[in-house]
Amino acid sequence: VIYCADDAHRFAFTADEEMTAVPAYTSTLGAYLYEPSAAVLKAGAFKSLAQRFDVKKLHPNSHLYTSDTLHADFPGRAFSVERTCGFGKRELKAFCADTAQANLTVRNFPATVADLRKRLKLREGGSDYWFATTLADESHCLIACRKVSKN
């Protein structure tokens, strides 16, 4: 049994459970986005996590999950999805028009945070969280979220 723990959550799984788990993948975001804790990521609990919490993976290598249900006991951070967009020039311009500042994370994406921040003219910080990632259909997506208090 492999145990993952941080200040707020504990998650335990077996290597067999991880090997045999069959997660669902999606290119459509639900109401919530989940980012596993560092402990879960380091332990490699990617598929078993999706199966145990009935969340869908956005891509096999992105390690971001989505669901229409809020899972307060998910071992990591939860966000409410506000809006999404692709990476077309016009689409990005409209998406960024009303936001000057956000916390930006990239997962399985072909640009760095610094490069993307420069391209989007986005300052660090604030209460908005943006994720740039690759979806199950191999398309690139920008996701604007708000952090959810799971207490």
Residue positions per predicted region:
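SAM-dependent transferase fold signal centered on methyltransferase-like domains
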Residues: 1-151
